[in-house]
Every structure is written in structure tokens, then in C-alpha cells.
């Protein structure tokens, strides 16, 4: 076990069970149903008859369901309705039958109902001794005695089975299977009812406290709320199992709890979520959502203030490859992965925000381990915190990041923005680390890890050591088109600190305006041999070694501009090994004090680099402009065939116009 070994929560394939579902809806689709009879139900209705004609003939809801046939509607009067007298009783949905709540008991048209004003409650409190708020159980601790195992059930029904406008409460699935699952609703064997305008409150089960969907059950949920439901195992709000793929739109999971998946638990389930909120849910792992061998799709989803005692405050993924677009993780907390935790998982994140999430151990925003390889594009990490990796922590994992920002994240120990550990090899393109803080590696920390950085900016990061980047224990990152500016360290390495046989390779990198006690630009300690080609180190500050400082380390430097190293003609061997082509001259930045590290037309760094050092496939600079651009009238002092690459992260793009004199001749 290493010093930061994670413990994978019990249960990567833990779920056998039957499923339950809950939902809230607006109006049911009518074109798919043939016109039929309107049947009426009331809390103290008749137990015989056809329940039709008028409200005067209203039956119990159980009776109305029994006599209804495909094409019928059941209008249900406000009040509390119970499924029967025994624990196995449940309201069973039927194909082609639409059940509507929210009636006062006088309406002649369905459009006259108001399900929010006229609360229609389906309750499992068959012994009528629960503590309720107007008939609704608001916490499962208020369930007393023995309630119905399932308030609602469906087996092999399709979308024409409709439930619309109800509170579902007080289900208590604490028996043996199948009565252990789906306290509020239990959907089984390819059941896919339509569920609208529903609130599931105070239901309990071993699995799927609010709803359980099992064996290909894929209900459609619109305007549904799951609140204060609990599961002693998995899925406090909802559990989806064995190819169950419900579709959720405008759904809220709030205050639900479980051992795993406080809001939702998916095991071989692939739900689609649009405009869904997970808020204030809790679990040992996966406070908001827990996925096992599942591939849910999330669009416009918010996970906020969810909590996990172990992994994944907002979400935990195990062997799962989900897709997230326009998703926000905010204020979630856990031991590992405050926002998201991935184990053996490869989610795709696009336009996702992680803000103010916290982890006690690693990964305030995201924690990746066990060879996880998520893909992130247009993602922002802001204000997240952890012991290791305030924004992101990777353990033996290699995510791919494009157009990502780490801003204002913090770590107590390593990696304010990102911490890489145990042979992690992330790839970063067009990434910015700004104003992150840590003890080691304000922007990034690498331990026995070798990320690849292309077009990356480190600016105004702070640390005790290594303001911008910390590399230790055989870490060999590759950097191309990277800037380190205005980073600071109290002790060593304002821009970069390399320690214990770490040898990064830097090509077209600029260090300027960084500060530290020792090694303002770069500090190399304990047998480090970094390679620098086409690099500028100028205008940094430290009491000892303002630009560059080596302790028992020998960098290899060529075609670079390092202040104080003398250039290749009068090389200072304390700087490292002279590979030729080096200069020691003011690079003439456009405005270094303002952070503009582009080159003025008179810069000696223009056309002074080495073409052969630029890796294949790198054709642009940090601005996205051509990497090889010739500036007319500037001598090529570098190595290669014109156009010669510039030193530093930015390629000068100047062009000159030649104006010929105007000659006027008289005729």
C-alpha cells in the first residue's frame, strides 16, 4: 500500500435487485391513447361499482384501477390514499390507463385540476401511525410500525401507463426480496411508465428508497422530486439496474441518503438526465450519484452540496464511461474526490464547472485512480480544495485536458491546481493554472509522474516551494509552448522546482517575473538533469539564483536565453551543460510587467532557436499562430532551415512593407 492508497468502496458489482421509480409530470400525452371512460377516485370512495359518471360515484383508487381498461383516465381527489390493508398491497399501474391527481372533487375538465394546491397523496402508511406533515412523511425516521413495501408498482407496462400529480410517501421495503427494493415505486421487467408532476418523500428500502427500476425498466420522468428517501444499501432516491435506462427531465434529488449513491445508483444502467439537480444528498460513496458499469448521459445537470464519507461527494464512477455536458459540481465534499471520483473509468466532460468542492485527502474537484482516463474539454476548476490536488488529483491515471482552467484552487500539501502521483501521465493542451496555492507546487505537483503540457500557462500561483510546478521522484514531464510568469515560492523554485532525479524536457518555454528565496525561475536539486531548448529565463527574482539555481544537478541547455549564464561564448558552467546556441541578452518582451511575454521586433530571441527540437506535430505557438515564422531583416542565428523557430513560448509574427519612392516625370 502506498502512502496515498485509495480504498475502493465495497461493491463494484453489488446489486441484484428489483427496481423502483418515482416522478413528477406536467401533462400526459393523449394522442397515443384512445378516448375512454373517466373514472373517479376519492380517499373514502366506494369499493364497488364502475367509478364513472361523476364524482358522486367515486371509488377507492384501488377499485378504480381494478375496473379501468386501456384508454381510461382516473381522476383522483385530494387527500391520502392507501393501497390496501396488507404490506404487499401496492397501486399497480396499467397499460393505457392514465391516473391524475390534484382534483378538488368538483371538476368537469382535467385542465381544472391543480396538483400543487390539491395535494393528492399515495401513502404506504397502512397502519396510519406515521408522523406526517399533512399526510406526507418528510423523513424516514418518522415511519412507525409496518408500512406497505411498495406504494406503487408496475410490471411490463409501457409509456401509456401514466401517473401524474401525486405525492408518493411512506413506502417501507424492508422485507426479503423483492420486498426489499423500491419503497416508493418498484418497476420490473421492462416497465416504462410515464411519470409526471410527482414528489417522492420519506420512502425507505434496502435498494432504491424512492424508486427502483430493474431488468430493462426505463420510465420517463418529468417534473419529479425525490426528497428525504433512504436506502440501507444503494440508491437513496433512485436505483437503476440491469439495462434500465430511465429518461429524466426537470427532476430534483434532494436530501436522500444511502450507503452508496445517496441520490441515484446505477448498476449496468444508462439513464439520460436533462436539467436535473442533485442537492444535499449523502452516502458513504457517491453522495449525489454512484455508477457501476454504467454510462449515463447528463446534460444541464447540477450537483451541489452532496456529501460522501469516502469517495465522490458529487459522483463516484467505477468502470463507467458516462457523458457530461453543461454540468456543474458545486460545494460537494468527500474524503477523495469532492466533486467527482473515478476508478477504472473514462467519463467525457464538456463545458463542466467544478467550484468550491472539498476533499479531506485528494482531489477537491476530481480524483482519478486505478488507470482512469477521463476526457475534459472546456472545463473550469475554481475554488476547490484538498490535501493533495485542490483542483484535480491523479493516481496512476492519465486524463486528457483541452481548454481547461484551474483558478484559485488550494492544497494543504501538494498540487494546488493539479497533483499527479504514481505514474500518472495526463495530457494538457491549452490549459491555464492561475492563482492556485499549495505547500509544494502551487500550480502543479508531479511525483513519479510525467504529464505532457502543450500551450499551458502558469501565472500567479503561490507555494512554500515550487510556485508554478513541482517535479519530484523521477518525474519527467514534457513542456512545449509554456509560460511561467508571476509565480512565487517562499523557499525554492518560483517558477519550477525539480527534485530527486526529475528531468523534465522544456521546449519553447518562457520564465519571467517569478520569485523565490532560491531559484526565482528554476531550482534543480538532487541529481536532476532537465533539458532546455528554445527557452527564455529572464526577469525572475530570488535572493540566491534569481534566474536559475542548481544543487547537485546539471541541466542541459541549448539555444536558450538564460540571464546570468553568459551565453555559449562565455558559458557559466554553474548553469549546467552548454549545448550551444545559448545567449545572455535582454529578450525584449512587449510588456513583461503586464505579463505580455511576446517578443518585440528587436528581440535577439527571434529566429534564434533550434528547429529540430520542436516535436513533430507542434505547428503553432502559445497564441495559436504559426510556430515557424520568419521575420524579415532579422538574421537567422538559430539552427535549421529558414524559417527558424524563436526562443520562448511566443513566435514573433512581424511583417514589413517596403515603400518605393514615387517618381514623377514630365512629358
What spans do the regions from the language model cover?
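Sec-dependent, cleavable N-terminal signal peptides
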Residues: 1-36
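Low-complexity, Pro/Thr/Ser/Gly/Ala-rich linker/spacer regions in secreted
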Residues: 28-37, 650-667
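Residue-level detector of buried hydrophobic side-chain packing
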Residues: 41, 64, 74-76, 99, ...
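Acidic Gly/Asp/Thr-rich repetitive segments characteristic of extracellular carbohydrate-active
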Residues: 43-77, 81-83, 90
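Predominantly extracellular beta-rich ligand-binding scaffolds that present long acidic/polar faces
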Residues: 73-78, 83-98, 107-117, 194, ...
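Right-handed parallel beta-helix/beta-spiral solenoid domain characteristic of secreted/periplasmic
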Residues: 97-177, 581-592
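C-terminal accessory segments
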Residues: 128-141, 145-149, 153-156, 579-651
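Extracellular repeat-rich scaffold modules on cell surfaces
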Residues: 154, 162-170, 177-203, 483, ...
Amino acid at each position: 500500500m502506498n502512502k496515498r492508497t485509495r480504498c475502493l468502496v465495497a461493491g463494484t458489482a453489488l446489486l441484484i435487485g428489483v427496481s423502483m421509480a418515482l416522478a413528477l409530470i406536467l401533462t400526459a400525452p393523449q394522442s397515443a391513447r384512445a378516448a375512454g371512460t373517466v373514472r373517479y377516485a376519492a380517499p373514502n370512495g366506494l369499493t364497488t361499482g364502475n367509478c364513472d359518471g361523476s364524482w358522486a360515484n367515486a371509488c377507492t383508487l384501488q377499485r378504480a384501477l381494478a375496473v379501468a381498461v386501456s384508454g381510461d383516465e382516473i381522476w383522483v381527489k385530494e387527500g391520502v390514499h392507501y393501497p390496501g390493508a396488507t404490506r404487499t398491497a401496492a397501486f399497480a399501474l396499467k397499460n393505457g390507463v392514465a391516473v391524475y391527481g390534484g382534483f378538488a372533487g368538483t371538476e368537469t375538465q382535467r385542465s381544472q385540476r391543480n396538483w400543487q394546491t390539491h395535494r393528492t397523496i399515495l401513502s404506504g402508511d397502512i397502519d396510519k401511525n406515521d408522523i406526517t406533515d399533512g399526510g406526507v412523511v418528510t423523513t424516514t425516521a418518522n415511519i412507525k410500525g409496518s408500512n406497505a413495501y411498495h406504494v406503487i408498482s408496475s410490471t411490463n407496462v409501457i409509456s401509456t401507463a401514466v401517473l401524474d400529480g401525486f405525492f408518493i410517501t411512506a413506502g417501507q421495503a424492508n422485507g426479503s426480496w423483492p420486498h426489499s427494493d423500491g419503497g416508493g415505486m418498484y418497476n420490473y421487467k421492462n416497465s416504462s411508465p410515464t411519470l409526471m408532476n410527482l414528489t417522492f418523500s420519506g420512502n425507505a428500502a434496502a435498494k432504491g428508497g424512492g424508486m427502483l427500476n430493474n431488468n430493462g425498466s426505463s420510465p420517463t420522468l418529468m417534473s419529479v422530486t425525490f426528497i428525504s428517501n433512504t436506502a440501507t444499501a444503494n440508491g437513496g432516491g433512485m436505483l437503476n439496474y440491469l439495462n434500465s435506462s430511465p429518461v429524466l427531465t426537470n427532476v430534483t434529488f434532494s436530501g436522500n441518503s444511502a450507503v452508496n449513491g445517496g441520490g441515484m445508483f446505477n448498476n449496468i444502467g444508462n439513464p439520460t438526465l436533462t436539467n436535473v439537480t442533485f442537492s444535499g444528498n449523502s452516502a458513504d460513496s457517491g453522495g449525489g450519484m454512484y455508477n457501476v458499469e454504467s454510462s449515463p448521459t447528463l446534460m444541464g445537470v447540477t450537483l451541489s452540496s452532496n456529501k460522501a464519507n469516502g469517495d465522490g461527494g458529487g459522483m463516484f464512477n467505477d468502470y463507467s464511461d458516462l457523458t457530461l455536458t453543461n454540468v456543474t459540481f458545486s460545494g460537494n465534499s468527500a474524503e477523495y474526490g469532492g466533486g467527482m471520483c473515478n476508478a477504472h473509468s473514462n467519463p467525457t466532460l464538456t463545458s463542466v464547472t467544478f467550484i468550491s468542492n472539498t476533499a479531506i485527502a485528494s482531489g477537491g474537484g476530481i480524483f482519478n485512480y486505478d488507470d482512469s482516463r477521463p476526457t475534459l474539454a472546456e472545463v473550469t476548476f475554481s475554488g476547490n480544495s484538498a490535501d493533495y490536488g485542490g483542483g484535480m488529483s491523479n493516481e496512476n491515471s492519465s486524463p486528457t485536458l483541452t481548454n481547461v482552467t484551474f483558478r484559485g484552487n488550494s492544497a494543504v500539501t501538494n498540487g494546488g491546481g493539479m497533483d499527479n502521483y504514481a505514474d500518472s501521465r495526463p495530457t494538457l493542451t491549452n490549459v491555464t493554472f492561475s492563482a492556485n496555492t499549495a505547500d509544494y507546487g502551487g500550480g502543479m505537483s508531479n511525483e513519479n509522474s510525467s504529464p505532457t503540457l502543450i500551450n499551458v500557462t502558469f501565472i500567479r500561483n503561490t507555494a512554500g516551494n515550487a510556485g508554478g510546478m513541482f517535479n519530484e521522484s523521477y518525474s519527467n514531464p514534457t513542456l512545449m509552448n509554456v509560460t511561467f510568469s508571476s509565480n512565487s515560492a517562499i523557499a525554492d523554485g518560483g517558477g519550477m522546482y525539480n527534485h530527486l532525479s526529475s528531468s523534465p524536457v522544456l521546449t519553447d518555454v518562457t520564465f519571467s517575473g517569478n520569485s523565490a528565496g532560491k531559484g526565482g525561475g528554476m531550482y534543480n536539486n538532487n541529481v536532476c538533469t532537465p533539458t532546455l531548448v528554445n527557452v527564455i529565463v529572464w526577469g525572475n527574482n530570488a535572493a540566491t539564483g534569481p534566474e536559475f539555481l542548481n544543487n547537485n544537478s546539471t541541466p542541459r541547455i541549448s539555444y536558450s536565453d538564460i540571464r546570468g549564464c553568459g551565453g555559449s561564448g562565455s558559458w557559466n558552467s554553474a548553469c549546467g551543460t552548454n549545448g550551444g546556441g545559448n545567449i545572455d541578452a535582454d529578450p525584449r518582451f512587449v510588456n513583461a510587467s503586464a505579463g505580455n511575454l511576446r517578443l518585440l521586433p528587436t528581440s535577439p530571441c527571434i529566429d534564434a532557436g533550434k528547429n529540430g527540437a520542436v516535436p513533430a506535430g507542434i505547428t503553432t505557438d502559445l497564441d495559436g499562430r504559426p510556430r515557424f515564422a520568419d521575420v524579415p531583416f532579422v538574421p537567422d542565428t538559430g539552427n535549421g532551415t529558414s524559417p527558424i523557430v524563436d526562443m520562448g513560448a511566443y513566435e514573433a509574427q512581424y511583417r514589413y512593407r517596403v515603400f518605393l519612392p514615387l517618381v514623377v516625370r514630365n512629358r
